[in-house]
């Protein structure tokens, strides 16, 4: 059934979208739209979202006002300058540690991690550097109860050179880090471009997945008849696996 959100103003409530998956939205869906934080949160609440991904502490008051949570916080790493290159570690680490504290303070479940550009590094070298970094911060994530999620992105169309572009690479990284608080952010749009075979891949690797992102393909558009990804069976498969995280 519908779960009422917390009152936003006197007498104003919004129901959560019904279903077995807790749906959220990414901040990026509001790109190009002139809305302040409060307006963005209200729009997200109106469509039944549980929260918004990739927002920081400046959003926390508005999220709380509309009964939302920050489903994933930025963690200081970047698509180009990520944790696969040790020259970025000193800059990223304090930002990630602060993001973990911020997340714990508001009971946000996740902080995003980005591998970074290959930039001449082999996949093995990059993974070794990621393991070194994550082994330094994983204890804090475990102590605070916040999950670090490494995003899988496509290197074919949107992010040439991005290292964590295959599920198998991400899963191997998870196994090496060996922490219940390090998982993958499985982006269905990006992995459709890189691998396809979405449902089988998710079923085989759900233990390593902490969060999902979605979009249509081609063109990262809305889920309509122009897009090749048919989401209903994907969503059913994820729900049937007992997934308890967020789907944004």
Descriptions of predicted regions:
Residues 1-47, 107-109, 164-186, 190-248:
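Histidine-acidic metal/acid-base catalytic patches
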Residues 51-53, 72-74, 112, 149, ...:
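Conserved beta-strand positions in the central sheet of alpha/beta enzyme cores
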């Amino acid at each position: 059934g519908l779960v009422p959100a917390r009152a936003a103003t006197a007498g104003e409530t919004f129901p959560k979208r019904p279903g077995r998956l807790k749906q959220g939205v990414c901040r990026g869906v509001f790109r190009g739209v002139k809305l302040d934080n409060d307006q963005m949160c209200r729009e997200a609440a109106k469509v039944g979202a549980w929260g918004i991904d990739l927002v920081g502490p400046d959003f926390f008051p508005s999220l709380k006002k509309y009964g939302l949570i920050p489903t994933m916080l930025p963690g200081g790493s970047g698509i180009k300058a990520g944790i696969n290159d040790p020259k970025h570690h000193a800059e990223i680490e304090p930002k990630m540690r602060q993001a973990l504290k911020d997340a714990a303070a508001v009971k946000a479940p996740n902080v995003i991690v980005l591998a970074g550009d290959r930039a001449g590094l082999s996949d093995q070298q990059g993974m070794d550097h990621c393991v070194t970094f994550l082994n330094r911060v994983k204890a804090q994530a475990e102590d605070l109860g916040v999950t670090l999620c490494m995003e899988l992105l496509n290197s074919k169309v949107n992010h040439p050179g991005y290292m964590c572009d295959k599920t198998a690479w991400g899963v191997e990284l998870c196994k090496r880090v060996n922490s219940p608080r390090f998982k993958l952010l499985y982006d269905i749009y990006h992995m459709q471009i890189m691998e396809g075979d979405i449902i089988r891949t998710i079923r085989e690797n759900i233990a390593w997945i902490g969060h999902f992102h979605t979009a249509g393909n081609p063109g990262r558009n809305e889920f309509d008849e122009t897009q090749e990804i048919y989401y209903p069976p994907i969503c059913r498969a994820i729900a049937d696996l007992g997934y308890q995280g967020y789907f944004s």
